[in-house]
């Protein structure tokens, strides 16, 4: 089920491929293969009613001479995309992965319930929990009002700093992109020099390679800043008009945190419940192998569930506000982004497309599990003094880590295809492969520039929150920190709060930039018809946009 069908009940908006007539007095159309060369309009250029600093764009530009773009073979198969490809059947995709995912989550919940129930019954081995008839032998830690105030102030400061950084990024996009790119290169060189000074040779060699690569690519990436700047400005403007995207990502963050806490307690409870000799092991069915197997299963289910949650959020953003803006334009009394776009996209992502999301997430989960298993083997070999075996396993870990990164990057665009066009995972992966073959370098550089700018904003936010935590402890002198023993944990926790808040806000921006990039590759003429002024600005900094992705 496509975004258009889902939002409009199957009514098409008329985004069929058009042959733009040449402007009056312009050269005749080239009939060779139906192609025409770009010819600027004659006379006074049309007024698109759009300022360059506001790429959010109006959906109703004044009529006038239309720019003529080169019609390649044809615009990313526009007829196909506005036909059957944009209207897949309304059905649940990838049913088998969906069933496996549901079974894994239900099994995890059952194991967790049994384990935590046994854990609570024996007071958590002195952890202060359980039936009062048995006795609460554990000690508890109570947060006083100083800690509560600190957490509230740090959270508020983190949100304010994240908002201010986005405002600065919107106002000074090009400057911040250039500065953060240069800072990344300088940081890599600095870490490399530091490791050489302290004679940490393995780390020094790794960062020497990273520094050389970053210096080599620096100049090439600078040339692509104009496109990243325009897409970033457009995305920030979209989110300014639709702040619900931030609500979506923060809800996702809260759910992820809750699932992580659930997994942590489950693993602890599994050890308590089934470890031989434990007070909770009363039925004689305990063994170390059972503990290992259940922890492995819990870890697998947790990683898969965590991946699915994050990818459902991505599909909600891509198929909701950002996809709705690209295909329908800004919200107006007569149309634009559909109402409750995020809610509708979430419903589709968590029902019809959940199997496709689970399919892609399973691939990443398997790779992450392999990496964790290799980590355990490497620690074992190092403990046995087998350095050669440890080095070989470390190399294997690096290889699997690289493969995992590539699969995750590939999957991000596949999920956007799923969110926009309602595909199952395999067709989405095929179209993503075509997209990345044709625009892979452009997408990678664009994501790197945007990601670097957002990353430095997160570090700045985390640092300022940590400074606030330090000064708060210094001037309030809470009783629990009379000897300064909790200063480091509180400062670190403050840093992590600010860091995560910025990364959460940044994930919405990253999703928007990638969604618009996919739209420009798959259906460039949609934006050309809806907002020719914005499309012309993009064409000036990225001429390939008029070609579309061949299929």
Swiss-Prot record:
Q: Where are the transmembrane segments?
A: 95-115, 148-168, 178-198, 201-221, 245-265, 308-328, 357-377, 387-407, 453-473, 489-509
What spans does the record annotate as topological domain Extracellular, numbered to this chain?
A: 116-147, 199-200, 266-307, 378-386, 474-488
Looking up InterPro entries in the UniProt record yields:
Choline_transptr-like (IPR007603)
**Biased composition regions of type Polar residues, renumbered to the chain:** 45-63
- Ranges in the Cytoplasmic compartment? 1-94, 169-177, 222-244, 329-356, 408-452, 510-551
Low complexity composition bias: residue spans: 8-19
What family does this belong to? Answer: Belongs to the CTL (choline transporter-like) family.
Name of the protein: Protein PNS1
Annotated source species = Cryptococcus neoformans var. neoformans serotype D (strain JEC21 / ATCC MYA-565) (Filobasidiella neoformans)
- Gene behind this protein: PNS1
């Amino acid at each position: 089920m496509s975004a258009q069908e889902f939002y409009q009940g199957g009514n098409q908006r008329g985004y069929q491929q058009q042959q733009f007539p040449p402007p009056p007095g312009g050269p005749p159309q080239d009939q060779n293969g139906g192609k025409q060369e770009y010819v600027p309009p004659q006379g006074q250029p049309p007024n698109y009613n759009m300022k360059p600093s506001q790429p959010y764009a109006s959906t109703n530009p004044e009529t006038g001479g239309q720019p003529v773009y080169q019609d390649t073979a044809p615009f990313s198969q526009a007829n196909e995309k506005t036909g059957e490809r944009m209207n897949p059947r309304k059905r649940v995709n990838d049913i088998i992965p969906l069933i496996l995912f549901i079974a894994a989550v239900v099994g995890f919940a059952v194991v967790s319930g049994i384990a935590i129930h046994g854990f609570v019954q024996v007071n958590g081995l002195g952890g202060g929990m359980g039936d009062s008839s048995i006795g609460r032998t554990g000690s508890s830690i109570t947060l006083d009002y100083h800690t509560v105030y600190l957490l509230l102030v740090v959270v508020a400061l983190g949100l304010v700093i994240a908002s201010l950084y986005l405002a600065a990024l919107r106002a000074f996009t090009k400057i911040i992109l250039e500065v953060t790119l240069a800072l990344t290169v300088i940081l890599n060189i600095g870490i490399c020099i530091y490791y050489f000074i302290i004679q940490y040779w393995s780390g020094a060699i790794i960062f020497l390679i990273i520094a050389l690569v970053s210096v080599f690519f620096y100049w090439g990436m600078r040339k692509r800043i104009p496109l990243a700047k325009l897409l970033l400005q457009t995305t920030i403007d979209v989110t300014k008009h639709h702040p619900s995207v931030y609500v979506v990502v923060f809800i996702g963050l809260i759910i992820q945190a809750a699932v992580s806490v659930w997994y942590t307690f489950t693993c602890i409870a599994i050890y308590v419940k089934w470890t031989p000799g434990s007070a909770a092991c009363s039925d004689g069915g305990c063994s170390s192998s059972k503990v290992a197997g259940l922890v492995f299963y819990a870890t697998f289910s947790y990683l898969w569930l965590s991946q699915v949650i994050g990818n459902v959020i991505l599909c909600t953003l891509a198929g909701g506000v950002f996809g709705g803006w690209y295909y329908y334009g800004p919200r107006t009394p007569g149309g634009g982004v559909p109402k409750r776009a995020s809610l509708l996209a979430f419903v589709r992502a968590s029902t019809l497309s959940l199997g496709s999301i689970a399919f892609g997430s399973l691939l990443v989960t398997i790779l992450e599990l392999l990496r964790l298993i290799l980590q355990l083997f490497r620690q074992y070999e190092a403990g046995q003094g087998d350095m050669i075996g440890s080095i070989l396993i470390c190399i294997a870990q690096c290889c699997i880590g690289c493969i995992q990164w590539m699969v995750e990057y590939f999957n991000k665009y596949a999920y956007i295809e799923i969110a926009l066009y309602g595909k199952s995972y395999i067709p989405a992966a095929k179209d993503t492969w075509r997209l990345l073959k044709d625009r892979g370098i452009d997408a990678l550089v664009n994501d790197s520039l945007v990601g670097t700018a957002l990353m430095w904003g997160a570090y700045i936010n985390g640092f300022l929150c940590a400074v606030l935590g330090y000064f708060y402890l210094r001037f309030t002198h809470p009783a629990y920190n009379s000897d300064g023993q909790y200063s480091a944990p509180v400062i670190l926790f403050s840093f992590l709060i600010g860091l995560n808040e910025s990364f959460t806000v940044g994930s919405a921006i990253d999703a928007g930039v990638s969604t618009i990039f996919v739209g420009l590759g798959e259906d460039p003429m949609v934006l050309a018809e809806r907002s020719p002024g914005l499309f012309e600005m993009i064409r000036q900094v990225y001429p390939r946009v008029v070609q579309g992705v061949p299929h």
